[in-house]
Amino acid sequence: EVDLVRKKLKWKYKPFEVPKEILSEWRKIGEQGIVQEKKWNAVFNKKSKKIKDEFLRIISNKLPNDFNKLLEVQKKKFFDLKPDIASRQSSASIIEEITNSLPELIGGSADLSGSNNTKTKHSKILKPSNFSGNYIHYGVREHAMAGIMNGMALHGGIIPYGGTFLIFLDYCKPSLR
């Protein structure tokens, strides 16, 4: 098959050989990246120590120092009160508490926000006209939702969460593998 593709494309280069024209263009793009990185670093270095430290914490996938304490308080509250509520309501209560503490937390739901309680009072909708939000309305797209969350988690610096009902989980499975 490889030979047929080479023949069809009239590809005269050896395996793993990059044509000079392509290599030259690729290196130009790399040089642009170096310039952009220098600009970004100049802006970043002007930020306050607090902002820089918070950014570095987030991008290195570390939780805030007091985060476990916050979770312990929530667990104790549920253990002591033993509320008679649906699991999605107890989950919403926890999400409500941690959303304000973790700027790297981005939530969303596949058209079920009101039912599965994934949207909090701290949630701001992420949309094409405003990328500063922390909540995504995926629409009826469980497969896309799971794939997007996997991509965010893989990139790092973002902790995604989402919600759907168990009956719709089969739509997510290809993206969850």
List the model feature ranges, each with a label.
Residues 137-177:
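Conserved thiamine diphosphate
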